[in-house]
Amino acid sequence: ILMDSPEDADLYHSEEIKAPEKEEFLAWQHDLEVNDKASAQARPTVFRWTGGGKEVYLSGSFNNWSKLPLTRSHNNFVAILDLPEGEHQYKFLVDGQWTHDPSEPVVTSQLGTVNNIIQVKK
């Protein structure tokens, strides 16, 4: 004699199994859409070097530390970048020498490297 056991219940209710999978998929899809919108909310962020120099570049965690030339504006050098919200590290390359802006917040790595740090907020 064959009898149904509680463990066999899932075999006969395959529709119930699919429902949570669909709900889970929709939840994932929602999370992805929210993340896309969050990353798309870049904020115009001004970087200014006031320490003089002839050639000034900006490098940071927001551009994989590649050199971005700053534009001379009167006695300063300026760049305006659209950055995603969050914390970013950066420093300046002034006439071939890496430096940070002593008038802005800094963070020191375990290796002793000093970078400026900026919080981009809404």
From Swiss-Prot:
AMPK is a heterotrimer of an alpha catalytic subunit (PRKAA1 or PRKAA2), a beta (PRKAB1 or PRKAB2) and a gamma non-catalytic subunits (PRKAG1, PRKAG2 or PRKAG3). Interacts with FNIP1 and FNIP2. One of its GO terms (biological process) is fatty acid biosynthetic process. The glycogen-binding domain may target AMPK to glycogen so that other factors like glycogen-bound debranching enzyme or protein phosphatases can directly affect AMPK activity. Non-catalytic subunit of AMP-activated protein kinase (AMPK), an energy sensor protein kinase that plays a key role in regulating cellular energy metabolism. In response to reduction of intracellular ATP levels, AMPK activates energy-producing pathways and inhibits energy-consuming processes: inhibits protein, carbohydrate and lipid biosynthesis, as well as cell growth and proliferation. AMPK acts via direct phosphorylation of metabolic enzymes, and by longer-term effects via phosphorylation of transcription regulators. InterPro entries: AMPK1_CBM, CRP1_MDG1_kinase, Ig-like_fold, Ig_E-set. Transmembrane segments: none annotated. The modification Phosphoserine is found at residues 5, 61, 66, 73. Keywords: Fatty acid biosynthesis, Fatty acid metabolism, Lipid biosynthesis, Lipid metabolism, Phosphoprotein. The modification Phosphothreonine is found at residue 113. Belongs to the 5'-AMP-activated protein kinase beta subunit family. Phosphorylated when associated with the catalytic subunit (PRKAA1 or PRKAA2). Phosphorylated by ULK1; leading to negatively regulate AMPK activity and suggesting the existence of a regulatory feedback loop between ULK1 and AMPK. This is 5'-AMP-activated protein kinase subunit beta-1. Residues 33-122 are annotated as: Glycogen-binding domain. It comes from the Eukaryota. SUPFAM superfamilies: E set domains (SSF81296). The keyword Magnesium does not apply. The keyword Lipid biosynthesis applies.
